Structures are given as structure tokens and as C-alpha cells.
Amino acid sequence: IQKSVGTEKTFSSDLSSVKDILIELNILANELEKRLFISKKKGKTITLKIKYYDFKQITISRTIEQYVNKKVDFFLIVKDLIIKASLIKPVRLLGISISNFKNLNIKQKKHQVDFNF
């Protein structure tokens, strides 16, 4: 059973400006939205992964009340998480994932009664 859906990117040159980081997070959020649509999942926990140039890694998560799978619903949270991360070093990798799912692909079982004549 899949526990999360996410995407990440390692950069060939480290990102230092918040503007560049937000541009890359926007691209990652677009990809994440596609993956959530394909997997037919909505989640309540948004996680931001940051790996710095020195390979130190942090993850920051927030769990919200509603299930989301659209960028418009989770990207503001991603931006808030990046602000809380206090970026003080150049960034080597960024990732976004969503977990704590509500499965949208629940199929009702059909029951059929067999009669032996």
C-alpha cells in the first residue's frame, strides 16, 4: 500500500535565492499534482524535504484538516513551510510529498447470489 506521493529534484548547482527556490517548488508542485491525479489520492499531510549543499537534510511537515490533491490547495502550505525552514545555506535538493491519504478509488463490491436449481 502506497504511503505517500511525492517528487524531488537534485540541482546541478546549488540554489541560494528564495526566488529560485520558489520557482523550483512551483515546478515540483505541478508534478506532484499530476502524480496525485494519476494515483487517485488525496492527502492531509504535506511534507517539504530540503537537502543543503553540505548534505544536511531536513523535513518539515504540516497536517491540515481537509484532504487535498490540487496545487492550489497545497502550494500555500509549501511556501509557508519554506519560510519556516529559515534557509541559511544553499540548497542542493528539494522535494514535496503528500501522505495521510483518503483513497479516491474505492470500489463498491457487488454481491451476486447464486441459486442451485
Show where each model-derived region lies.
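DNA-contacting surface of Y-family translesion DNA polymerases
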Residues: 1-91, 101-106, 116
